[in-house]
Curated annotation (Swiss-Prot):
Disruption phenotype: Deletion mutant cells display reduced 5-methoxycarbonylmethoxyuridine (mcmo5U) formation in tRNA(Ala1), tRNA(Ser1) and tRNA(Thr4). Reduced 5-carboxymethoxyuridine (cmo5U) formation in tRNA(Val1). Strongly reduced cmo5U formation in tRNA(Leu3) and tRNA(Pro3). Cells lacking both trhP and trhO show complete absence of 5-carboxymethoxyuridine (cmo5U) modification in tRNAs; cells display a temperature-sensitive phenotype and decode codons ending in G (GCG and UCG) less efficiently than the wild-type strain. PROSITE patterns: PEPTIDASE_U32. Keywords: Hydrolase, Protease, tRNA processing. The gene is trhP. Changing C170A: Reduced 5-carboxymethoxyuridine formation in tRNAs. It comes from Escherichia coli (strain K12). It comes from the Bacteria. One of its GO terms (cellular component) is cytosol. One of its GO terms (biological process) is tRNA modification. Belongs to the peptidase U32 family. This is tRNA hydroxylation protein P.
Length: 453
């Protein structure tokens, strides 16, 4: 049966290596200055070449993201800066701006181009247009339903399509947001988003003054035990002022229409339950978001979605335990996004803007060093003798209770204190530990309070 590509994020070479070790078929990484993760991008030209070479040596693919919305100044140096990247031999460029796409088609006509999600492709005519422009794949907008994706697949059957299946969602249409730029002059479309949508805001009632400006009313609004009711009833005729917690006294106006108020913090996408249907549709690539995430995130998401894809291709039923495994990653709550239609409160997290897990915490990375039955672990977070742990490897996972660990001198250690320490754990000598990771299973704790009930 047809098997879609599993495409993982690579914010660093280490993330790339873990993604490949745990089953990714391809990774994507940003070109310096021209992608939307310029603040969190390890990749310079040297690392790009290393990554491309390592991917190809493994029979994998490496895509370079060039999806910035450029102003004129960026055009002056674009071809000069891109030429050495093209010469490295990436498998495709991921692009959104029609002008930059035109320049690449003119100067590097053999270079495959994938249309970025930033281009907002939401219908089959758009996909067909970009096919006629010579692109080889379109990454569809996250705002599409399963039925819309299937119609696009049927209308343009000879064009590759790619779908996001996991990771953060943006409050704006395919990430075309102005909020960060408006509040603190960091333009998301130039790769410097500060995730202002995740911040804590206070909402206070305002009023319209004599000349039509929205001004502060200076009267508190009593709010107690309010449940989200978006999509129910008529929109309010009130206007409101938003105050971000770290910017007291700075107010922005907010309105409500028939869709609700746009505040503002989306849950994370988790579409693993739909991998089987997307596979049957013939979607060519299933993509995981997260170029700013950890190597543990890259490893775990690759492992879980690898199994889901393999099971779907083999005709096996969906393994619901994979949903629980993904709960072990810190997240903002999960949603299926727009793949199936929900009420608005299923999309949004109204309680907090940070990522958290009440199932597991990543606590250590096996270094590869061994002393007999002991293996070295570089500690990342605190754990103790008696804890329930999971040892995760590309070959499979093992849950166990930690009964003993030592320091480098062979002295017993009841506690691995935290980042910067190395401890030695008993591990069978025949167990392969390349890319092995260690997680602590919670019992009433969370990653926000990992050692308190």
């Amino acid at each position: 049966m047809f098997k879609p590509e599993l495409l993982s994020p690579a914010g660093t070479l280490k993330n790339m290596r873990y993604a490949f070790a745990y089953g990714a078929d391809a990774v994507y990484a940003g070109q310096p200055r021209y992608s939307l993760r310029v603040r969190n991008n390890e990749f310079n030209h040297e690392n790009l070449q290393l990554g491309i070479n390592e991917a190809h040596a493994l029979g994998k693919k490496f895509y370079v993201v060039v999806n910035i919305a450029p102003h004129n100044a960026k055009l002056k140096t674009f071809i000069r800066d891109l030429k050495p990247v093209v010469e490295m031999g990436p498998d495709a460029l991921i692009m959104s701006d029609p002008g930059l796409i035109m320049l690449v088609r003119e100067h590097f006509p053999e270079m495959p181009i994938h249309l970025s999600v930033q281009a907002n492709a939401v219908n089959w005519a758009t996909v067909k247009f970009w096919q006629q422009m010579g692109l080889t794949r379109v990454i569809l907008s996250r705002e599409l339903s399963l039925e819309e994706i299937e119609e696009i697949r049927n209308q343009v059957p000879d064009m590759e399509i790619e779908i996001f299946v996991h990771g953060a969602l943006c409050m704006a249409y395919s990430g075309r947001c102005l909020l960060s730029g408006y509040i603190n002059k960091r333009d998301p479309n130039q790769g410097t988003c500060t995730n202002a949508c995740r911040w804590e805001y206070n909402v206070q009632e305002g009023k319209e003054d004599d000349v039509g400006n929205i001004v502060h009313k200076y009267e508190p609004i009593p709010v107690q035990n309010v449940e989200p009711t978006l999509g129910i009833g008529a929109p309010t005729d009130k206007v409101f002022m938003i105050e971000e917690a770290q910017r007291p006294g700075e107010y922005m106006t907010a309105f409500e229409d028939e869709h609700g108020t746009y505040i503002m913090n989306s849950k994370d996408l988790r579409a693993i339950a739909h991998v089987e249907r997307l596979t049957k549709m013939g979607v060519h690539s299933l993509k995981i978001e997260g170029r700013t995430k950890s190597f543990y995130y890259c490893a775990r998401t690759a492992q879980v979605y690898r199994k889901a894809i393999d099971d779907a291709a083999a005709g096996k039923p969906f393994d619901t335990s994979l949903l629980e495994t993904l709960e072990g990653l810190a997240h903002r709550g999960y949603t299926e996004g727009f793949l199936r239609r929900h009420t608005h409160d299923d999309y949004q997290n109204y309680e907090y803007g940070y990522s958290v897990s009440d199932r597991q915490q990543f606590v250590g990375e096996f270094t590869g060093e061994r002393k007999g039955d002991l293996a070295a672990v570089a500690v990342k977070n605190k754990f103790s003798v008696g804890d329930s742990l999971e040892l995760m490897t590309p070959q499979g996972n093992i849950n166990f209770t930690l009964e003993h660990m030592e320091n480098a001198k062979g002295e017993a250690m009841p506690i691995a204190p935290g980042d910067g320490y190395t401890v030695w754990l008993p591990v069978p000598q025949d167990l392969e530990l390349n890319y092995a990771l260690l997680m602590r299973n919670f019992s009433g704790e969370t990653t926000r309070n990992p050692h308190g009930k």
